[in-house]
Design a protein with these regions (language model features):
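Metallo-beta-lactamase
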Residues: 2-19, 33, 51-52, 101-239, ...
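N-terminal short beta-loop-beta anion/metal-coordinating cradle
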Residues: 17-41
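Short, hydrophobic/aromatic-rich segments at coil-to-beta transitions
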Residues: 22-29, 51, 127-131
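Pre-active-site segment of Zn-dependent metallo-hydrolases
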Residues: 34-74
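Short His-Asn-centered micro-motif
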Residues: 53-56, 76-80, 100-102, 135, ...
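Active-site environment of divalent metal-dependent phosphoester hydrolases
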Residues: 59-60, 81-85, 105-109, 161-164, ...
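Active-site HxH/HxHxD metal-binding segment of metal-dependent hydrolases
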Residues: 63-126
Length: 240
């Protein structure tokens, strides 16, 4: 059986049913090979074009649901690490364009005709309904999305918001890495994944000015509240 068949065992990880956070914006929470989990976000624009952030392998009912939302316009790989199911989803929606890091294109040149980069995407989303913001100063080629209509910020590894750890060992790890019970950047980001602190913090200050109502992270719980203050405070506490 073809490994990409919708009836095969290619969907290894479980996920929740779609949840509509706000009108025309849905999430699916999924398990992963580690305790961090993952999240797929789906945004439908006013012209019924649909963008999928961090695509996950899905069973046929959820793929049918995606198709029912409108034309699948684009698939967004949030950074160079979260691309495991991008090719699979691209096969299910062959007309969708792909927003991805340069490193992914280098490995898959046959898809170059479908690739979009952040500087080009602004011109294909009507009235900037969805903003694509590449993160400078980091080593993992992340792109953040902002949905102005709902003031929702969608990111991946720039910040985490994990629930309380269940074991003493994990609690110690969370404390060491600044990654539990608070929507914040991790120490891994600060010490290992940042290559230009000044550039990153300037970008972060611009994110804070967007003052999102919610921050949809890939790992952990969705932050609801004064997103601008949370971004400023959490980065200031960690980076100084």
């Amino acid at each position: 059986m073809d490994k990409n068949s919708l009836n095969s065992q290619s969907v290894k990880f479980t996920y929740s049913p779609p949840t509509e956070l706000v009108p025309s914006l849905w999430i699916l929470d999924g398990t992963w090979s580690n305790f961090l989990g993952r999240r797929m976000t789906v945004i439908r624009l006013r012209n019924n074009e649909v963008w999928i952030h961090n695509p996950m392998r899905l069973h046929k009912p959820e793929l049918d649901w995606l198709s029912s939302l409108g034309f699948i316009r684009g698939l967004v790989a949030p950074n160079q690490w979260h691309v495991s199911d991008l090719l699979w989803m691209a096969e299910q929606f062959p007309e969708a364009q792909i927003v991805c890091p340069q490193s992914f294109l280098d490995r898959h040149p046959s898809l170059s005709s479908r690739m979009l980069f952040t500087t080009d995407v602004q011109h294909v989303t009507p009235d900037h309904e969805l903003e694509f913001l590449p993160v400078p100063g980091v080593r993992f080629e992340e792109t953040v999305l902002f949905h102005p209509l709902s003031r929702t910020l969608i990111l991946c590894d720039l910040m985490m918001n994990l629930p309380p750890a269940e074991t003493a060992l994990r609690r110690a790890f969370f404390k060491l890495n600044n990654m539990g019970e608070c929507c914040s950047p991790t120490r891994t980001l600060k010490w290992l994944l940042t290559n230009d602190k000044k550039e990153l913090l300037h970008f972060v200050s611009q994110l804070a000015e967007l003052n999102p109502r919610r921050i949809v992270v890939n790992h952990g719980e969705i932050f609801e509240g004064e997103g601008g203050n949370q971004i400023r405070t959490s980065f200031a506490l960690l980076f100084g």
